[in-house]
């Protein structure tokens, strides 16, 4: 399968030279190291988020470095993970997105976060792979690809919302030429310090989307 066939419309904003360099490095790493996520999930965020429906870009640090945790979707966990065993970062994100401080009926929260991606959020890390148990180990490998990706997206799609989670993601702000850029602490920081992520992040995104496009993101289902 060619890159054009695999990435579909995303190929418009992907620097194929940088991508090929990263893929060559990936092939070497996966054959000699333990790497997260599974190779078939590295580009999963692009598969789930339709390019023509892109509204928001979330950028984190790197995938969960523990075995069988990373899914290729920023902050997402597998559907079969018990609620009390969710990753600390996802617990922080869930609490802010649902905002349990306001009244709710019963809710369903998609812990895979695939539903967010399908609604037009590109959910990527600033490094798409990581060596198992070695946080930040592939940061420089992916930086050229992610940098050019963000620049090309912003030039081709004015008016998007970009959320940069943590200091590493924040270093990519100069690549973003248009749109709204929001910088917030990484939820891992909130988990470590036992602080909360501000729910205004999610309500603010929806206010802007409603104002610009007349739509909002359904962060959870309520019934």
How would you name each of these model-derived features?
Residues 1-4:
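GGW-centered surface loops in extracellular recognition modules
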Residues 6-164, 168-176, 180-183, 189-192, ...:
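A polyanion-binding, active-site-adjacent surface
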Residues 213-215:
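Short, charged low-complexity linker/loop segments at the C-terminal edge of domains
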